[in-house]
Amino acid sequence: MSSQVVGIEPLYIKAEPASPDSPKGSSETETEPPVALAPGPAPTRCLPGHKEEEDGEGAGPGEQGGGKLVLSSLPKRLCLVCGDVASGYHYGVASCEACKAFFKRTIQGSIEYSCPASNECEITKRRRKACQACRFTKCLRVGMLKEGVRLDRVRGGRQKYKRRPEVDPLPFPGPFPAGPLAVAGGPRKTAAPVNALVSHLLVVEPEKLYAMPDPAGPDGHLPAVATLCDLFDREIVVTISWAKSIPGFSSLSLSDQMSVLQSVWMEVLVLGVAQRSLPLQDELAFAEDLVLDEEGARAAGLGELGAALLQLVRRLQALRLEREEYVLLKALALANSDSVHIEDAEAVEQLREALHEALLEYEAGRAGPGGGAERRRAGRLLLTLPLLRQTAGKVLAHFYGVKLEGKVPMHKLFLEMLEAMMD
């Protein structure tokens, strides 16, 4: 994969309101802090409009609940940062509640962001959560004043999480001591000790993304496929950022990092779909707001992919996959690259062995004293990787066919990764 992969200007799927100086740039990434998986608003089980919630924002002046978009006849002032409906003047400029809260949180928390692309990500309502670095830069460029944020006041009950200014990668290689961890999502039945690597993987797990299907799009399966292409594009860059936070990955040469990502990115994305679908019954959660059953996937233009993905989901459901096991399996899928372009195969093997050892350590703590139970469980988890690769191959082949048809616009990063895998 060429060095241009993370800095390519995308094609645009739809025009969106934005300020005149909104930059046109590359695919963006979401680097919001990880949050606990918790019950949220009911997901969309078709492709209507999506009511976005972000940092306490509900339906805006032009929206109503229930996934339907209702436009007001009143003239609207637009947010100069993302183009959403402005709720007023905040910190000196017309802005929406989401961008106001984002700017305030950034200043009060002294948060520093980095763009994994080219620092020219487009910031719109649809993609404002994709790259926080470029979003903050846009806030400053349109005139938001840092001096307007009081540093002695922080949000109270509305605060959903606290963000760490920076997550430092763990040293690698090295020991991963076990220790207690409060696991998000409620008490565990078995209080297994979690080693430092697992704790780190839980911390750097990306925040959930939304598909945000276009409510104004035409009927038929093409808008659904376009929505998924846009979602995958954003997930790719999130995956790039996530991979760089895995201990040992950043120690690889840049060429090897790209070769690894190029060969397994779809496996990481497919595993994410499967993990989000675990609580569901015969349904696939492509995103928090896009859930399809097998028939719905077929109607959305995915052919038999729904059946293939559900086969993987049921395999993981039978194993009762835990979140700690998921983050380890996801990292192992990354390190399980079979790319022939890897220059330092020994370094990749070292990363894979460290992750395998962490999985064994976690399963040993989960199983308690006894012989062999942890290795049997770890073995069953690892045996899902071939099915994951097979399923990802089917998804790749399907979307490469969509690319060849030329009926659905795709962002260039997604195109680049597709072509690299299929060449």
Swiss-Prot record:
Effect ascribed to mutating residue 129 to R: Abolishes acetylation by PCAF/KAT2B
Underlying gene: ESRRA
Coiled-coil boundaries: none
Modification N6-acetyllysine occurs at: 129, 138, 160, 162
Subunit annotation: Binds DNA as a monomer or a homodimer. Interacts (via the AF2 domain) with coactivator PPARGC1A (via the L3 motif); the interaction greatly enhances transcriptional activity of genes involved in energy metabolism. Interacts with PIAS4; the interaction enhances sumoylation. Interacts with MAPK15; promotes re-localization of ESRRA to the cytoplasm through a XPO1-dependent mechanism then inhibits ESRRA transcriptional activity.
Species for this entry: Homo sapiens
Cross-link (Glycyl lysine isopeptide (Lys-Gly) (interchain with G-Cter in SUMO)): 14, 403
Compositionally biased intervals (Gly residues): 58-67
InterPro entries reported in the protein's UniProt record: Est_rcpt/est-rel_rcp, NHR-like_dom_sf, Nucl_hrmn_rcpt_lig-bd, Nuclear_hormone_rcpt_NR3, Nuclear_hrmn_rcpt, Oest-rel_rcp, Znf_hrmn_rcpt, Znf_NHR/GATA
Listed CDD domains: NR_DBD_ERR, NR_LBD_ERR
Keyword Nucleus on entry: yes
Impact after mutating residue 22 to D: Represses transactivation activity in response to coactivator as for wild type
Protein's name according to its UniProt entry: Steroid hormone receptor ERR1
